[in-house]
From Swiss-Prot:
Residues 32-518 are cytoplasmic. This is UNC5C-like protein. The gene is UNC5CL. It comes from Homo sapiens (Human). PANTHER family: NETRIN RECEPTOR UNC5, UNC5C-LIKE PROTEIN. The lineage of its organism: Eukaryota, Metazoa, Chordata, Craniata, Vertebrata. Keywords: Cytoplasm, Membrane, Transmembrane, Transmembrane helix.
Length: 518
């Protein structure tokens, strides 16, 4: 009996111990095959107690999966068809595939063309000869207001421009096209352009284009494109140097009307670019908020702390509803260009029985200080707000939109600047053009102190929505036939036509789109 029992024990031990161990190993391998890597990483983090156990990791994973469900083929076709349909010179704002986009599209041929996004400082120039003779290409220019499409940045990097896409993705031309957009870096040499060679709906893969400062001027990025993709600009200061960018502080509120008991102010901390302000204006439209006064500039230091907004004065008859008179904006929210805002809510004080406060509360005056944490005594901006019930701004804004601002082609702009810059004995230089545009002697003397008076005058002409036909007429009147000839050559090369004999005649020509005037 004993020998038999001793010979039976090893096999019994294998059955009792080996089978459960093998089952556990097989189960672990199955889990490893089926469990996504992100979930496994989260499980290991929880087991290592590097994160609080209460973190709802599965819920976050489900939320992410719901937000990033792959688009169906019909959805993608409709998405790109909408973006590439000609907009007849108009700038469109649409929510497409959960992305807020601003875009314009048109067809171009061998004569080239220019696309502009209204009030954003973004343009795309397709030069003459970029498209083969006999062909037509649809092109689009897109401003991406989806913050998730921006590059993933380190604490040392700051976003200083919008994300811009040129479409269709991957399109190439016989000549380089020129993309122009604004940046807010204090030092242009620290501004580095990035490109993501992906479509709008794909995961972005951002890579630098050249060295820092290669495509940046004082406040603008200009990139010569060999093919179309996504582009942006990132602030990268050299080691040991401070990285800084310009912010614009914008104050919004709804109209103050009689009988209104509460009033809310919203203060936005935006990159100092036109498109950032347009985003805030668009964001305020559903709430009836309107911009109060001009934006104020702020020199934001990338190496400093959070931004503080401190309420210092409220006019009599009003009180602060919030518990605190000081609010903080996280440093990285501003540094990475997320367009944050903070708000204060005020209410009218109840009047005493023996005192009439109606005369005091039909107007509100507020003073706020804003500064980076720890720098209150060194650098601070003062924000003042005033509103009254009698102001005309309380009326709803008009429905009609202002006309877009035309823009001269860069190469023609530079050629005219060089021709008009030198002072002429007869006075038919940039000063004569300034007089034709309605500037008085004092303003002309002020412009003479600028770095490039001719460039300033040409920019003023752009802001007045002048066409090339009008500028040709002015040059002829000024007897500047060299400038008129340069404009004529550009028009002949791009449109095959001659400028109209009368000022404003181009606006009556229905055959020319807005972009084609330039």
């Amino acid at each position: 009996m004993c020998p038999q029992e001793s010979s039976f024990q090893p096999s019994q031990f294998l059955l009792l111990v080996g089978v459960p161990v093998a089952s556990v190993l097989l189960l672990a391998q199955c889990l490893r095959w089926h469990c996504p890597r992100r979930l496994l990483g989260a499980c290991w983090t929880l087991n290592g107690q590097e994160e609080p156990v209460s973190q709802p990791t599965p819920q976050l994973e489900n939320e992410v999966s719901r937000q990033h469900l792959p688009a169906t083929l019909p959805e993608m076709v409709a998405f790109y068809q909408e973006l590439h349909t000609p907009t007849q010179g108009q700038t469109m704002v649409r929510q497409l595939m959960h992305k807020l986009l601003v875009f314009s599209a048109r067809e171009v041929d061998h004569r080239g063309g220019c696309l502009m996004l209204q009030d954003t400082g973004i343009s795309l120039l397709i030069p003459p000869g970029a498209v083969a003779v006999g062909r037509q290409e649809r092109v689009s220019l897109i401003l991406v207001w989806d913050l998730s499409d921006a590059p993933s940045l380190s604490q040392a990097q700051g976003l200083v421009s919008p994300v811009v896409a040129c479409g269709p993705h991957g399109a190439s031309f016989l000549k380089p096209c020129t993309l122009t957009f604004k940046h807010c870096a204090e030092q242009p040499s620290h501004a580095r352009t990035y490109s993501s060679n992906t479509t709008l709906l794909d995961a972005k893969v951002w890579r630098p284009l050249g060295r820092p400062g290669a495509h940046a001027s004082r406040d603008e990025c200009r990139i010569h494109l060999s093919h179309f993709s996504l582009y942006t600009c990132v602030l990268e200061a050299p080691v040991g140097r401070e990285a800084r960018k310009w912010l614009q502080l914008a104050v919004f509120c709804s109209p103050l009307v009689p009988g209104q008991s509460h009033l809310q102010l919203r203060i936005y901390f935006l990159n100092n670019t036109p498109c950032a302000l347009q985003w805030a204006l668009t964001n305020e439209q559903p709430h009836g908020g309107r911009l109060r006064g001009p934006c104020q500039l702020f020199d934001f230091n990338g190496a400093r702390g959070d931004q503080c907004l401190k309420l210092t004065y409220i006019s009599e008859g009003w009180e602060n509803v919030d518990d605190s008179s000081c609010q903080l904006v996280p440093h990285l929210h501003i540094w990475h260009g997320k367009c944050p805002f903070r708000s204060f809510c005020f209410r009218r004080k109840a009047a005493d029985e023996n005192e009439d406060c109606s005369a005091l509360t039909n107007e509100i005056i507020v003073t706020m200080h804003t500064f980076q944490d720890g720098l209150e005594t060194k650098y601070m901006e003062i924000l003042r707000f005033q509103a009254s019930e009698e102001e005309s701004w309380a009326a709803p804004p008009p429905v009609s939109q202002p006309p877009p601002c035309n823009r001269l082609p860069p190469e023609l702009f530079e050629q005219l600047r060089m021709l008009l810059e030198p002072n002429s004995i007869t006075g038919n230089d940039w000063r004569r053009l300034a007089s034709h545009l309605g500037l008085c002697g004092m303003k002309i003397r002020f412009l003479s102190c600028q770095r490039s008076p001719a460039a300033a005058i040409l920019e003023l002409f752009e802001e007045q929505n002048g066409s090339l036909q009008e500028l040709h007429y002015l040059m002829t009147v000024m007897e500047r036939l060299d400038c008129a000839s340069a404009i004529q050559n550009y028009l002949s090369g791009t449109h095959g036509g001659s400028p109209g004999p009368e000022r404003g005649g181009a606006r009556d020509n229905q055959g020319l789109e807005l972009d084609e005037k330039l």
